[in-house]
A protein has these predicted regions:
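Beta-strand-rich domain onsets/edges
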Residues: 16-28, 32-35, 91-94, 104-122
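Exposed aromatic-hydrophobic patches
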Residues: 68-73, 109
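Short, ordered, surface-exposed loop/turn motifs in non-cytosolic proteins
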Residues: 35-52
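Sec-dependent bacterial lipoprotein signal peptides
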Residues: 1-17
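Short proline/glycine- and polar residue-rich coil/turn motifs
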Residues: 63-65, 99-105
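A short, solvent-exposed beta-strand micro-motif common in secreted/extracellular proteins
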Residues: 73-91
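Short, acidic Ser/Thr/Gly-rich low-complexity loop/linker segments typical of extracellular
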Residues: 51-69
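Exposed beta-strand and adjacent loop surfaces of beta-rich binding modules
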Residues: 26, 41-43, 78-80
Length: 122
């Protein structure tokens, strides 16, 4: 009888004790045109709009041949994504949001469209 009680107790302790202490929050942004073709050399900025945390949670990189950039953050967060191409003013722009999940690479697709200075923003 004791063996029957010990086995479920041991299984419970083993299964409940398995937690990842320091999860990572990787994310990937893919930039394409309206036809779905990946675009390289696009500046991608990922930031949070929380006062006091902008510097800590700010990433910037340029897309490669495959139109991808990858980042990793330490905490769960929602990032604002801004993708731009060209000088000042931009020639193309795209934006969106991405919610990070622990230990899962979350992907966001940003569609780059021609920038219209008379209608700024995304």
């Amino acid at each position: 009888m004791k063996k029957l009680l010990i086995l479920p107790l041991l299984a419970f302790l083993l299964l409940s004790g398995c937690q990842i202490e320091n999860p990572t929050f990787p994310f990937r942004v893919k930039v394409t045109n309206a036809a779905g073709v990946p675009i390289q050399n696009v500046i991608v900025e990922a930031s949070v709009d929380v006062p006091g945390y902008r510097e800590e949670a700010y990433f910037i990189d340029t897309t490669g041949f495959d139109g991808l950039v990858e980042f990793e953050y330490e905490y769960e967060a929602v990032f604002k994504i801004l993708a731009t191409r060209g000088g000042n003013p931009f020639t193309h722009i795209g934006c969106g949001f991405i919610k990070l999940e622990p230990n899962t690479t979350v992907q966001s697709k940003i569609i780059l469209l021609p920038y219209d200075p008379s209608d700024p923003g995304c």
